[in-house]
Regions:
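Intrinsically disordered, low-complexity Ser/Thr/Pro/Gly-rich regulatory segments
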Residues: 1-284
Length: 284
């Protein structure tokens, strides 16, 4: 049997070892990123995929955020992004009347997002690949503005086997909140996206997590059953599942399913409030 090294040999070996190199990453900025670092992760902020400059003047950002609070405007902008060459207002979405979509196109010009090209057509000045980055920007900004969270969006973790970025992470009251945002309608969501979300929860262990689908459609038809099936496959308990409001579900006291019906940020706020109450100590 091979002899184990003694105390002296262990100490000599450790003392003669080459000092470890410092990680080539800047220190985390903000409490949300610091909480990820304390979990042994290497969070890195990515460049946002936005149809506007990342550093907007505050008065422009405030007006844009106000427009994004309208579900119809989000539908319009999502459709405009899908037509990078040029678009007519009526081509952006079939769910918004021509008069309103024209108003949104003119607002986009006023905000500096678009310009008039020719024959009533418009072109986005800063093409984006999808609406996802804009949704992250809006939700992150409103979490900070309305609730005082420290927020980061589009965070890469450099973890093998864990694809994609963290859409939104937020910190307050010593708690870490993770939000995954989906800008596609429920019919476009696949089971592997639910699986990936649960994998991220296992890695992050956030105090509170929200799976947010920016749609007015019912989540109980497809998305909720997909979550229950995934939870059952993983052996998670689902006895605590309950509806908090219309299409706002508490899958567990820490995991919430949210849609964008009527007021997206109000729905997110309700889920956060329910989660914070569930995590709070008993009064008596």
């Amino acid at each position: 049997m091979k002899r184990k090294p003694g105390v002296r040999e262990l100490e000599l070996g450790a003392a003669s070892a080459v000092p470890p190199k410092a990680l080539p990453l800047p220190p985390p900025t903000g409490e949300a990123m610091a909480m990820l670092a304390r979990r042994g992760l290497r969070p890195e902020k990515t460049t946002g995929d936005l149809p506007f400059p990342a550093q907007l003047e505050e008065h422009v950002a405030a007006r844009l955020s106000e427009w994004l609070g309208h579900y119809a405007f989000r539908l319009f902008l999502r459709g405009a992004i899908q037509k990078p060459e040029s678009f007519l207002p009526v081509e952006t979405t079939r769910y918004v009347a021509l008069e309103r979509s024209t108003e949104y196109a003119e607002a986009s010009v006023d905000l500096g997002l678009a310009e008039i090209s020719s024959r009533g057509r418009y072109t986005l000045k800063y093409p984006a690949r999808s609406f996802g980055g804009t949704l992250e920007w809006y939700v992150g900004r409103e979490l900070a503005r309305r609730f005082g969270f420290d927020v980061e969006t589009g965070v890469k973790l450099h973890v093998p086997g864990l694809g994609g970025d963290l859409d939104v992470v937020a910190a307050a009251e010593g708690k870490l909140i993770y939000l995954e945002l989906k800008s596609s309608p429920p019919r476009n969501l696949a089971a592997n996206e639910i699986t990936a979300f649960c994998d991220r929860l296992n890695l992050l262990r956030p105090d509170l997590s929200l799976f947010v689908v920016d749609t007015a459609l019912r989540l109980s038809d497809k998305i909720l059953p997909m979550f229950l099936e995934e939870f059952q496959r993983r052996g998670y308990g689902i006895s605590g599942k309950k509806r908090i409001a219309a299409q706002l579900w508490a899958l567990t006291p820490r995991i919430y399913l949210v849609n964008g019906s009527r007021d997206l940020m109000m729905n997110i706020g309700k889920a956060i409030a329910a989660g914070f109450r569930a995590l709070a100590p008993e009064v008596l």
